[in-house]
């Protein structure tokens, strides 16, 4: 089966989302807490954890999770 560049982008986004969720849970934070700290909506955090987020939102969420060191 051939994979397109879009397929790999979708895969990378889903892996990144799963990692964001794992980090959040390891920090014992709720989606609402991350959203509040990142100045985004809880829905934005939820979507990011599903692999669907804008780069600016990902950066804000990573900052809220103290991952931009």
Where are these regions (language model features)?
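N-terminal flexible/basic segments that precede or flank functional cores
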Residues: 1-14
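Residue-level signal for the short linker/turn that defines the boundary of a DNA-recognition helix
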Residues: 18, 28-29, 53-56
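Short helix-to-coil "ATP-lid" hinge immediately C-terminal to the conserved N-box Asn in the Bergerat
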Residues: 25
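Short alpha-helical DNA-recognition segment
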Residues: 28-44
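DNA major-groove recognition helix of helix-turn-helix/homeodomain DNA-binding modules
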Residues: 53-69
